[in-house]
Swiss-Prot record:
Entry's family note: To M.jannaschii MJ0803.
Protein origin, superkingdom: Archaea
Signal peptide stretch: 1-24
Protein name, UniProt field: Uncharacterized protein MJ0695
Protein keywords: Signal
Amino acid sequence: MNLWEFRFGKSFLFIPNFIMKVLAFEELALFDIFDSLINVKINIYENGIECGFSFYKWDEFKGYKIEDKYIRLISKFPLIIRLIFVRDIYLRYDEELEGIIEKHLRQK
């Protein structure tokens, strides 16, 4: 076997298979991350809300919206900042939770 066959023969066939396995793993990992974000524990304070390991002040949101079974806290920052730092937060809908959020934010 020469070096050319080794580089582009067997090892080349290995690369697409490896990439497909990595993509499948990333898809499962992203699903787990999304699922864990929905099921995160929250604490509500007078000056903000704690979701998981992050704390958000009420003035970082411009309002809230009820979508299906979730309450969406809408960030007031531009899209670029929202994609990196402060994102919209989705909380499972609960009447008591909506009443608390209603005191601090207005509905859109």
